Regions:
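Long amphipathic alpha-helix in the N-terminal Rossmann-like dinucleotide-binding domain
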Residues: 66-69, 110-114, 121, 132-147, ...
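Structured, charged N-terminal subsegments at the starts of enzyme catalytic cores
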Residues: 84-129
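Short, well-ordered beta-strand elements within core beta-sheets of diverse protein domains
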Residues: 99-104, 118-125, 201, 221, ...
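Rossmann-like NAD(P) dinucleotide-binding subdomain of oxidoreductase/dehydrogenase enzymes
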Residues: 187-347
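Hydrophobic or amphipathic alpha-helical targeting/insertion segments
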Residues: 152-153, 176
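C-terminal segments
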Residues: 2-83, 163-164, 168-193, 211, ...
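Short, flexible/disordered intra-domain loops and linkers
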Residues: 258, 375-386
Length: 574
């Protein structure tokens, strides 16, 4: 339901707590930036923002204070002053059935673009070190309100609280800091100035002083998604901002609040640091407005970051010719099972990946390819049906108790997922049916357990496209060799963000790795413990590769940031 209003005044944004001197910010965050720069080079474990919501980490009142701050937004007008606001829009509907009713200021495209363009020159002239430090200060400010943000993520996406806190808060902030570090590294790849002297025979040498300016491309447009509004949006937002571009944030209509909070604190810090807060603006859309498409085709918009459907991602790539377009779309994530020395651990690990957030992660496995003659395990050879039953049984155990299940599954993000579960039942033999769960805390929440289907490799058309949601297929193949062929064929055409293999045979592991190199997808081998295929760690793991149809870029590498700015030089005789 959309509400648009033109009466009433926006609640004022709070006055700046204190002015921030840019030089002091550079000094304040120098150590953090240096550690982040080192982390992206080393690729070992490093995290700047603690992932545990424990009171021992964040303080005894942090959780309650954050929830209270979140609740002040409900049923009211979000406190965000932006240029040219002409009305109010409210489009969110919580998967938990909680009434949100938050209204956001709506501005026309022309006003947003004009304000963003005017804000850029001073931001450009501040230079890489200042921009990087201000971006880290924004992340620090958001982190001060991380419980407020986590509640917003939970109630707009359907994630259970711990996941909403971790993925929507510290993990998203780490991914943002990672992109800032890459931006800092790329902007500093060339010196700011150079003295040039060329011998000229018997005459005086030719001498010039040269200056190399990092120049932004233009306006960056970030188009948010419903499921991970911060985690998927922060890398592009902060990569563009750090490299000198203004950013317009267009949230998904069902998940506006997390990005509205983000924009609020970004604007607050920018203003305190002496910059135009219109460097970061929110562009919520009214129902049917299609403001993302309008913005994406504006000549001033030079960068587009998008996470969502293949159909719309393809449209952006094919139509926003004036911009560099970074997309993450759909794929068919696959597990190849050949053999294992820990069958119970394998089943438990796969089950957790299938259950977490009801399979609504872009990295969740869908197809599990198993030889129809079975596999070798630590207890001997077992048949295909026993493998399938082991995985299905592990999922059933995870979701057997409703109160515990909802802390893993969360809620279903939209009606399309519920419809898809119903449609999928006719696409195979049901090994484990999806069931409706009554949430003990939120009676109107929409909760469904995973659906697991049995299929045969002869019916490839049943499982060769993405079925987004808690839907997976255990597929009987003629052999591991055929499993690899199917993997290459489907992922080579449709793409994937993750792949996994289970085998005690080094030659099989090598063959699977070769296959993943050919189709450009990241591989995890023999996961049986506390690492899961659908999770990735900032500063170490790359999310997506940009090497297959599921995404045209990676989070995060140098290529993700280097095309967001240009080097423009000037030279003078000395």
């Amino acid at each position: 339901m959309t509400a648009t209003h033109t009466d009433g005044a926006v609640a004022s944004e709070p006055a700046p707590r204190h002015p921030l001197a840019v030089a002091s910010l550079i000094e304040k965050h120098a150590a953090t930036i240096a550690k982040a720069d080192a982390a992206i080079a080393d690729r070992g474990y490093w995290s700047h923002f603690p992932e545990s919501p424990s009171p021992k980490v964040y303080g005894e009142t942090a959780a309650a204070d954050g929830q209270a701050a979140f609740e002040t937004y409900l049923g009211g007008r979000f406190p965000l002053e932006q240029p040219g606001a002409t009305g109010w829009v409210a489009t969110e509907r919580s998967p938990f059935g909680v009434a949100l009713g938050v209204e956001y200021p709506h501005s026309d495209v022309e006003t947003l673009v004009t304000a963003a363009t005017a804000a850029m020159p001073a931001w450009r002239d501040a230079g890489p070190d200042a921009r990087t430090a201000v971006c880290v200060e924004i992340l620090t400010r958001i982190h001060e309100h991380v419980f407020e943000l986590a509640n917003a993520v939970q109630f707009t996406t359907g994630q259970a609280f711990v996941m909403a806190f971790q993925a929507g808060g510290p993990h998203a902030l780490d991914r943002a800091l990672e992109s800032v570090a890459y931006a800092h590294t790329e902007m500093k790849r060339h010196p700011a100035t150079a003295d040039w002297e060329k011998p000229a025979g018997k005459g005086d040498p030719l001498r010039m002083s040269k200056t190399f300016h990092v120049v932004p491309r233009g306006i960056g447009l970030v188009i948010g998604c419903n499921t991970f509004p911060t985690w998927n949006s922060y890398p592009g937002l902060f990569a563009s901002l750090a490299t000198g571009n203004a950013v317009i944030v267009k949230p998904h209509p069902l998940a506006v609040l997390p990005l509205a909070i983000t924009v609020k604190y970004a604007r607050e810090v920018l203003a305190e640091a002496g910059f135009d807060p219109d460097l970061v603006q929110l562009a919520p859309e009214a129902e049917g407005e299609k403001i993302a498409s309008t913005l994406a085709l504006r000549p001033e918009v030079k960068i587009v970051d998008f996470t969502g459907s293949t159909q719309y991602g393809d449209w952006l790539e094919q139509n926003a010719h004036q911009a560099s377009v970074y997309t993450e779309k759909a794929g068919v994530n696959t597990i190849v099972v050949d053999s294992t020395d820990d069958f119970v651990g394998m089943c438990r690990n796969v089950a957790f990946s299938l259950t977490l957030y009801s399979g609504q992660m872009c990295t969740t496995p869908q197809n599990i390819l198993v030889p129809r003659d079975g596999i070798d395990t630590e207890s001997g050879h077992i048949g295909f049906d026993e493998v399938a039953a082991g995985i299905a049984g592990a999922v059933a155990k995870l979701v057997g108790d409703d109160a515990r299940a909802v802390e893993l599954t969360g809620a279903i993000v939209n009606d399309g997922v519920v419809s898809r579960i119903g449609a999928a039942r006719s696409h195979g033999e049901v090994l484990l049916d999806s069931r409706e769960v009554k949430h003990p805390e939120f009676p109107d929440a929409v909760v469904r357990t995973p659906l697991i289907l049995k299929q045969d490799s002869a019916n490839e058309g049943m499982f060769d496209s993405e079925w987004f949601g808690p839907i997976s297929f255990v597929v009987a193949t003629d052999s591991t060799a055929q499993s690899l062929e199917i993997f290459r064929r489907i992922v080579g055409k449709k793409g994937a963000l993750t792949a996994a293999v289970y085998s005690t045979d080094e030659s099989v592991l090598d063959a699977m790795e070769d296959a993943t190199l050919d189709v450009g997808v990241h591989l995890s081998c023999n996961l049986t413990g506390g690492v899961f295929v659908n999770q990735s760690a900032a500063f170490s793991d790359f999310h997506a590769s940009g090497a297959n149809a599921a995404a045209n870029s990676a989070l995060t590498d140098g290529a993700y940031v280097s095309n967001r700015f240009r080097i423009v030089q000037s030279r003078r005789h000395v």
